[in-house]
């Protein structure tokens, strides 16, 4: 009994370990928000669902007295807790014969398909909605952009607002919808020759800000995560009714946000271990969170419809 159970379980652990780097590579390639991932050295986990991030507050300069010397000032460092809001998952099964008849491609394709079609878009949408709702009130603009010149003027005004808030110039990232990206191209006169008969009108950087295009379904001010049960069996996410607005563009300085993927591991069960059916079983679960740091809300600027 011990022999027949232990070997398959060990095999499934090995399979999960094998697929984990593969899934991480897909995430890095396809995610639009991965560029904002928080460095692990700045994050401290406490318990199952709490993330602590170090926050340092100081006071400003004071007059120096030649007799009394320096005026004392406070420098306080604290760990601020953030609770993971999102714990998502789904279970899938591929019949053993279906998998055999496709030379194992059915199960192998399942992993990449789930990640590309469901996990990555939902994680992106959740993060951008969190950042849109967490931006300082004065950094949120409602507008309809339909011309290149007006779009460029709007983005320039946004950068001025960030400049005045003393958000660092270096490292800002300009996330744009596909429509706004087209308007940016229309508003800028330039052309790059990439070899014979090859002309490129693309824009990768604007005013030192890297441009990242985000599909509009992932780019909403508010989303609803569907339960995946009877009332919303398809699962996934959708723009929140009435409050979910299409984002035109968003400028984010990475230091203004915190995003963490706490748990993202596939659990794989072979037909020998699966007690429910003669099938390969895949359980996908991921717990994550995204926040705008309370003292850096000016580090985000949002334009939405």
Model-predicted regions and their roles:
Residues 2-60, 80-85, 91, 102, ...:
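Sequence/fold signature of self-assembling virion shell proteins
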Residues 47-52, 58, 71, 78-107, ...:
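Structured, hydrophobic secondary-structure cores that serve as assembly/anchoring elements
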Residues 67-73:
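Short Gly/aromatic-enriched secondary-structure transition segments
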Residues 98-167, 178, 302-305:
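Alpha-helical scaffold segments that mediate packing/assembly in large oligomeric complexes
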Residues 129-139, 166-181, 217-226, 267-276:
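Short secondary-structure transition/capping segments
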């Amino acid at each position: 009994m011990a022999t027949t159970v232990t070997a398959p379980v060990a095999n499934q652990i090995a399979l999960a370990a094998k697929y984990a780097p593969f899934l991480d590579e897909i995430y890095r390639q396809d995610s639009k928000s991965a560029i904002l991932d928080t460095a692990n050295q700045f994050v401290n986990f406490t318990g199952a669902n709490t993330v602590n991030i170090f926050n340092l507050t100081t006071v400003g300069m004071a007059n120096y007295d030649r007799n009394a010397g320096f005026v004392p000032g406070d420098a306080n460092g604290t760990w601020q807790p953030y609770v993971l809001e999102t714990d998502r998952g789904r279970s899938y099964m591929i019949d053993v014969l279906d998998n055999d008849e496709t030379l194992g491609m059915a199960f192998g394709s399942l992993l990449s398909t789930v990640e590309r079609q469901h996990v990555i878009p939902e994680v992106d949408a959740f993060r951008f909605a969190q950042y849109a709702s967490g931006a300082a009130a004065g950094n949120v603009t409602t507008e309809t952009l339909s011309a290149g010149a007006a779009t460029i003027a709007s983005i320039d005004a946004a950068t001025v607002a960030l400049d005045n808030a003393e958000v660092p110039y270096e490292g800002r990232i300009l996330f744009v919808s596909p429509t706004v990206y087209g308007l940016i191209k229309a508003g800028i006169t330039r052309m790059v020759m990439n070899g014979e008969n090859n002309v490129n009108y693309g824009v990768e950087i604007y005013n030192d800000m890297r441009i990242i295009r985000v599909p509009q379904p992932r780019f909403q001010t508010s989303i609803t995560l569907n339960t995946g049960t009877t009332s919303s069996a398809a699962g996934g996410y959708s723009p929140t009714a009435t409050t979910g607005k299409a984002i035109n563009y968003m400028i984010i300085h990475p230091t203004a946000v915190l995003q963490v993927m706490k748990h993202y591991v596939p659990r794989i069960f072979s037909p020998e271990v699966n007690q429910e059916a003669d099938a390969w079983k895949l359980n996908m679960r991921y717990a994550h969170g995204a926040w705008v740091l309370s003292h850096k809300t000016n580090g985000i600027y949002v334009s939405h419809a």
